[in-house]
Amino acid sequence: MARKGILGKKVGMTQVFTDNGELVPVTVVDVTPNVVMQVKTVESDGYEAVQLGYGDMREVLTNKPSVGHAKKADTTPKRFVREIRDVALSDYEIGSEVKADEFAAGDIVDVTGTSKGHGYQGNIKKDGQSRGPMAHGSRYHRRPGSLGAIINKVFKGKKLPGRMGNHTRTMQNLQVVAADTEHNVLLIKGNVPGANKSFVTIRSAVKAAK
């Protein structure tokens, strides 16, 4: 089955009432009409995909390659460009727009974004480990625990202090509560990855119940 997709920007969270009176937490995603920047085919690119662009880039940040690429679609360079695979290429034409009506209430989607960055953190905050005793002469408070049975080797994957967050994450099987075509907004049930004002990619769910 062909998938659909659209790019947007996370606005924030709110809550809405459904028709039966249920209060549902939703994430508001701005989906200002995307522009089809490129249509990739097996013959020309080795795979099928449609390239979408969201949000105009400031002119001072553009360069000649980005301007030339956008010119083929009769548009301006975009801030956020991503590809959507497994789509029906016949539904897309270079330079056309993809709007909020791409999805409807009740659709199940996967949302990909960049999680909030927390910088360099220790085991307690990063991995949820327990701290040591804080009194009675203990000299072990927030340090990592044992590194394993072999004294001169640290096994791959060992949880140690390091950078936390700022990873690409996908939340699957989220429900579209409403699609507001007048204000170019999608309301998605629950939360989606990333901070407010961060870019997200919304695709038809790959594991949705059939």
Swiss-Prot record:
This is Large ribosomal subunit protein uL3. GO terms for molecular function: rRNA binding; structural constituent of ribosome. The keyword Ribosomal protein applies. One of the primary rRNA binding proteins, it binds directly near the 3'-end of the 23S rRNA, where it nucleates assembly of the 50S subunit. SUPFAM superfamilies: Translation proteins (SSF50447). Keywords: Ribonucleoprotein, Ribosomal protein, RNA-binding, rRNA-binding. It holds the Pfam family Ribosomal_L3. NCBIfam families: L3_bact. The keyword Lipid metabolism does not apply. Part of the 50S ribosomal subunit. Forms a cluster with proteins L14 and L19. GO terms for biological process: translation. One of its GO terms (cellular component) is cytosolic large ribosomal subunit.
